[in-house]
Amino acid sequence: MKADIHPDYHPVLFRDLASGKVILTRSTATSSKTETWEDGDEYPIIEVEISSESHPFYTGKQRIMDSAGRVERFNQRFANFGKSK
């Protein structure tokens, strides 16, 4: 591989604003804000609105949309459409 062409890959904290959970991982993203982690070291922190900690798909708190009522209303409205009177 060529030297000096890859972005800086370093430890970064990600804070989920919806749940408040903070995750330490590695990323090429950076931030001017820093925060001290549990190990005593200081890392850049990036705040995200939603992550796997708060997304309904990953938390199992999905809402199922009930479209049956809308389909029934559509069928009632157009039940006689195209039929001669």
Swiss-Prot record:
The keyword Ribosomal protein applies. It comes from the Bacteria. PROSITE patterns: RIBOSOMAL_L31 (PS01143). One of its GO terms (cellular component) is ribonucleoprotein complex. SUPFAM superfamilies: L28p-like (SSF143800). GO terms for molecular function: structural constituent of ribosome. The keyword Ribosomal protein applies. InterPro entries: Ribosomal_bL28/bL31-like_sf, Ribosomal_bL31, Ribosomal_bL31_B, Ribosomal_bL31_sf. Keywords: Ribonucleoprotein, Ribosomal protein. One of its GO terms (biological process) is translation. Part of the 50S ribosomal subunit. PANTHER family: 50S RIBOSOMAL PROTEIN L31, CHLOROPLASTIC, LARGE RIBOSOMAL SUBUNIT PROTEIN BL31C. Belongs to the bacterial ribosomal protein bL31 family. Type B subfamily. This is Large ribosomal subunit protein bL31B. It comes from Kocuria rhizophila (strain ATCC 9341 / DSM 348 / NBRC 103217 / DC2201). The gene is rpmE2.
